[in-house]
Amino acid sequence: GSYETAWTWLHKLRRAMVRPDRELLAGVVEVDESFVGGRATGRQGASTDKVPVMIAVENAGTQVNRKLLLGRVRLAVADAPGSKQLVEFARTTVAPGSLIRTDGARMFRVLAQEGYTHQYVSGYSSPEPGHVTLPGPHRVASLLKRWNAGTHHYRVEREHLQYYLDEFTFRFN
């Protein structure tokens, strides 16, 4: 019983939490990216210390008390921030025929030609903050960061981050 044995078993469990044939997200799906990683206090903009994470979340509407209802979520590590990999992520996680809401990134325009209904809900120069225009991904990113800070103390290496994202997805869904 060593730390290495426990760590290895936890990673095996994290890998087992994802079904390769899981259903695609459907309905209204919000897609965005966020950054996960170590603390970068006092800096603005994209940090080189943090890892870009792609987020897709079903928006199930709002309840009577105006609280946002979220459906299932999908998370994946991105190679670089703002990459076209985000479009491929949307293709592989969202069912055709769904409404995909994104920020003003031009790369998403191709989705309208591939059987998706695409809606820009904000642009880079929008006066509305992201948590207002794309509340689903921002809520999930906030929960993910709090979970990472509280459970793992910001100590998840990039090479293992996808396993931790899979665990978070399993717990969230």
Which ranges hold each PLM region?
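Residue-level recognition of single "structural anchor" positions
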Residues: 1-173
